[in-house]
Structures are given as structure tokens and as C-alpha cells.
């Protein structure tokens, strides 16, 4: 059996340049860029931002980012400061959810919802 090295979602971007700036402000590093895609990396994980947008897809796209301490990550990253700069929806601070995980929520400029969750183990 082949060893699986990663799963990288393709994330839509309504405004490709604004989305790249948004993710860099969140701490992602841009590792590749051309006119149709950008690869953004955080730690050892990455995703592919695509210069492609369909409203219904973007607004139903969700990604979960798992961290060891969500409160510490939230305090360090300060996602609330991105609202005015990028005209994104207000983030929801971390709180214990009904499914048992502590999660904060962040919207990107295209409406993609990120669940920033504390690792439960």
C-alpha cells in the first residue's frame, strides 16, 4: 500500500489577491504561486488556493484547523483584526461546542468557514 503523505483541499477565492493576503496575515506562508493557484503552508500542512469562485460552493466550504491550545492560538493570531482589513464576517471566539470540541470560527474573504479547533486528545 502507498504511504499517504497529505490531503490538500482546493479552496476557492473570489478575490485571489485579497485571499492570499488574508491567509498570509493568518500566518500561512506562500510556497507556490501562479495565475490559477497558490499553495499556502502553515507548519507541515498546506492547502491549494484556487483562482476560482462559485458562491454556493465557497459559502458551503468548511475546513478544520486543529491546534493544541485554541485560546493561545486565537490570542496570538488575533483573527478579529482581520474583519476591517479584509471585509470578512466577524469571527466567533473559541467555545465548547455540543460535539465536545472547543472551536473558534473564522470566515475568509470568499465566505469559506474555518473551524479552529483544539485537539481533544
Residue ranges of model-derived segments:
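Short, charged/polar, Gly/Pro-enriched secondary-structure boundary elements
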Residues: 46-48, 55-57, 111-112
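Core segments of cupin and vicinal oxygen chelate
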Residues: 10-47, 53
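Conserved beta-strand in the GNAT
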Residues: 48-50, 105, 115-117
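Active-site beta-strand termini and strand-to-loop segments that position acidic
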Residues: 40-44, 106-109, 119
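N-terminal beta-strand motif that seeds the catalytic metal site of vicinal oxygen chelate
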Residues: 1-17, 63, 120-121
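Acetyl-CoA-dependent GNAT
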Residues: 52-53, 91, 96-97, 118-121
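Short acidic/glycine-enriched loop/turn segments that link adjacent beta-strands
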Residues: 34-36, 57, 98-102
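Vicinal oxygen chelate
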Residues: 63-113
Amino acid at each position: 500500500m502507498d504511504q499517504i503523505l497529505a490531503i490538500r483541499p482546493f479552496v476557492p477565492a473570489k478575490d485571489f489577491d485579497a485571499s492570499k493576503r488574508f491567509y498570509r496575515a493568518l500566518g500561512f506562508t506562500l510556497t507556490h504561486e501562479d495565475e490559477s493557484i497558490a499553495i499556502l503552508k502553515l507548519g507541515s500542512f498546506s492547502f491549494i488556493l484556487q483562482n476560482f469562485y462559485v458562491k454556493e460552493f465557497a459559502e458551503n466550504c468548511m475546513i478544520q484547523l486543529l491546534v493544541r491550545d485554541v485560546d493561545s492560538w486565537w490570542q496570538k493570531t488575533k483573527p478579529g483584526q482581520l474583519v476591517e482589513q479584509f471585509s470578512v464576517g466577524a469571527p466567533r471566539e473559541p467555545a465548547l461546542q455540543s460535539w465536545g470540541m472547543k472551536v473558534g470560527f473564522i470566515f475568509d474573504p470568499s465566505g469559506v468557514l474555518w473551524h479552529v479547533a483544539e485537539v481533544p486528545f
